[in-house]
Amino acid sequence: GDVYKRQKLIIPYGLFVCTGSVSPTLAQKYTGFSEEDLNLLWDAIMNMFDFDKSACRAEMATRKLVIFKHDSIYGNAPSHKLYERVHVKEVNPGKPIRSFSDYEVTVNDTDLPAGVSIEVRE
């Protein structure tokens, strides 16, 4: 067969953006999920690739965790509006991306909705 059909595609660098949420009302009512559990979850997300060094994910790492905290268990703002405050842009558009430093990640923390705060972990 054709040798090119057997070669793996190599992407020199990729940046994944993930979003998620925790429902405090469901956690309180059904699971007993606590603030301590939440902190363990944040630590797990930050370190989830430390012991997962397969050939296809050799250098994966969590680079930044942006946490939006609400004063109310029912939330103080829609999650999609908060996610829109996180911006990722190329430092040198048009130049090949080779590392995390080729991106600029910013969080707009001005005029936050009442009852919302931001924590950033790196």
Regions found by a protein language model. Give the residues of each.
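Short, small-residue-biased leader/transition segments that mark boundaries at the very start
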Residues: 1-4
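Short glycine/proline-enriched loop/turn "hinge" motifs that connect secondary-structure elements
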Residues: 7-13
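Beta-strand elements of well-folded, non-transmembrane domains
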Residues: 20-26
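Short conserved micro-motifs at the rims of enzyme active sites and ligand-binding pockets
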Residues: 29-32, 78-79
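Long, well-ordered alpha-helical scaffolding segments within enzyme catalytic domains
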Residues: 33-52
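Short, conserved secondary-structure transition motifs
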Residues: 50-81
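C-terminal accessory extensions/subdomains outside the catalytic/core fold
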Residues: 74-122
